Amino acid sequence: LWMVGSHSLKRGKAKATYDTKKNLELLGKVEPDANRFFLGCVFLHKNKNNQFRLSLSESDNNTRAAQIRCDATTSELLDEIRRDTLFTRFCDKNGGIPGKDNGIDIEGLACTRNGRVLVGMRGPVLRGIAIVLELAPERIDSPNTKADQLQLTKIGPTGLKYRRHFLDLAGHGIRDLCWDGDDLLILAGPTTGLDSPPLVFRWKAARKAFGKMSSDEEKFIWRSENVLVQQSLGSTGKQAEAGADHAEAIALFDKKHLMIGYDSPSTKRFHKPASVIVDIVDL
């Protein structure tokens, strides 16, 4: 089970209930959040009923949790992003642009069959182009700690510890990633807090495309009928409500349906304690 933090800076949020002075202070406050600089995994055990449970072992090297080097202000991944000439204007060691202002903001994760990890970038969107980073983490046994270390390896043509894939998502950033067979489903949305209906793009045969790429290759994936298309979604759930219901996550419900979860869900989605209504849409 893989997890990734946004690696973004956060800006204070103005509110109608505050006076002008307080709102100006909030908008001028940009700071890191230690919980955001994380990439790691925990091992899952599968029983005979196809149910999974987390492995909490600290001794078995094959099932120990693992994470990349990180602290309260950065990580191995963010250090690499800062070295990337495409992103240096968005982040440096002295600060940067907050995530919700089209700064660095990671959302969405999917794994390939050869051990690579794909992370989607909600921002920055560069002149309408969204970016997926392909990572190749390697586990390093760390017997004197509670978790092993993951180390990113250099891949791709840039000498960085990731390879970039550039996607034409009509100006939207990436909110989540999900495999559907060999196709990669991409939940897209604004880099800021704008309202938007759920948008899902299908990168056809993406799994095969990764396998065919040479080690020194990066590609632009343009919208076309045979490669990258926007999905037509037939909703069988509640419709997204303006001012709320920001599509945040997707997962296959079955072979013909996709489940969509929302950040800041409408109050209409809460019908009993400890539960929330999501949408099931036709693929």
Predicted regions and their residues:
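Sequence/structural signature of beta-propeller domains
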Residues: 1-283
